Amino acid sequence: MKSTLKKLLPFAVVGVISGATTVGGLQYFGHNSSNGDQSYFTTAAPNTSFAGMNTGAVGDDFVKAAKTTVPAVVTIKNYQSRTASRASEQDLFDFFFGDPFGGRGQQRQKQQQAPENMPSGMGSGVIISPDGYIISNNHVVAGANKLEVVLSNKKSYIATLVGTDPNTDISLLKIEEKGLPYLNFANSDNIDVGQWVLAVGNPLGLNSTVTAGIVSAKGRGIGILGSQGKATNPIESFIQTDAAINPGNSGGALVNTNGELIGINSAIQSTTGYYQGYGFAVPANLARKIVEDIKKFGIVQRGFLGVQSLDLSNDQLVTSYNKQFKTTLKVGSGIYITGFGENSGAEDAGLKKGDVITKVDNYDITDFADLSMSIGSKRPGDKVQVTYVRNGKEGTTSVTLRDQKGGTSTRTKADLSVTEKIGAEFDPLTERFKTEYGLNSGVVAKNVSEGSEMAKIGIVDNYIIIEVNGKPVNSQKDVEKTLEKYQGNVQVKFVDDYGRIYTKGFKMP
């Protein structure tokens, strides 16, 4: 079963998912840690310049852009509750077979669980409005129980996490202040390969660092959001730059020489974890759409074509597909439709298996990154013109995008199910498991979403939930029934993978 699933996974891409192969050495770079590496600083030879370049004009542009950008880029400190990394063997014995010390074991367990609030990491963020909205990366804020924002003038604030989107690695924070310096979004569709850009952030603890480079490529899919993040339907169409980017730059600004925001720095390609030539930024148009959704609806609105597909530009995938399905597809450009998901808008619009998508609206589709960007910036109910090739002939059809449940209207947080609101699903424990470990109730957490309420209190996949608000739960329906109309603080009693029992809470969204 596993081998069959593994073979099919590269081709069974439902909706719009980046299908690029993962580039070796790709890493997020949001969290700083002290290290003992020596730093070497060199000075360029006098009167050295690039041949044929008006260095004075470019330098003036850099200065203006830096003066605009630096005050609007902040440091974000991520604080998390730290607990003992492992439970002792006695803890496991106490939990499953009772406490032989008459309560002393339980007291010892509580002492080990006592959290220490301390900074876990640091990243960057960009102020995008004078009233304190800040955009950053999802991985910069993930797991935080407190977020501190430090401005370039060293003034500090405790931030509210407004929302996150692991599928694009974007988060939105808010601090209570007025009259803040901020950056305007540029139209990232209009950037050109080769144009000058500045990366501004707080790498390696060096606040307000500005580096320069060019746009090295556009529409780059690198496979990092699905492999290192918790994205279920990742959208990867990164701006690639050779501006120096290092740990701590995550969530910082990539700007043009006018000081306008063209991207949010997110990842680097490196074998060491430090700058080796290339960084990747989420395009401003996509980032802006995500934060607008979060502000307006409380959640991100995602439209889907509803196709299973193959990236014809990927030599490895095409070769594997041909071998497995005895086909003779040729490597080229475009997206080959291999099938359809449930409630597919593309299928209802007349697209068929074997069609090759070549354009969405006026956007040329050469690979998955192009398709994910063109659809990922849309909402359910939006219509797109899809150009395709069938049996050598070109056709066009209008597709109404749908959400993953087949709906064509936008939803707010109030429309979400209980499991969507708290960010997890649940499977029942088997009776054999309950009997073996002496449990009267319990469900197993699965598909815990990054940044969700369940994730914030430390629950991950495969943790056992025993009670919700003091009530035993044995199924997902039990959880939903307990919280369906509930407003207020939720108390969750759960067991981690070392057998330690916790009771933690969150406010029902």
Residues of each region from the PLM?
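Active-site loop architecture of trypsin-fold serine endopeptidases
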Residues: 31-33, 37-38, 46-50, 54, ...
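Extracytoplasmic/secreted envelope proteins and their assembly/folding machinery
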Residues: 59-66, 70-71, 89-94, 98, ...
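Short, glycine-anchored, charge-dense loop/turn motifs used at functional sites
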Residues: 74, 131-133, 258-260, 354, ...
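Short, surface-exposed secondary-structure boundary micro-motifs
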Residues: 78-79, 139, 196, 202-203, ...
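Short beta-strand segments of a lipoyl-like beta-sandwich/carrier module
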Residues: 182, 213, 237, 252, ...
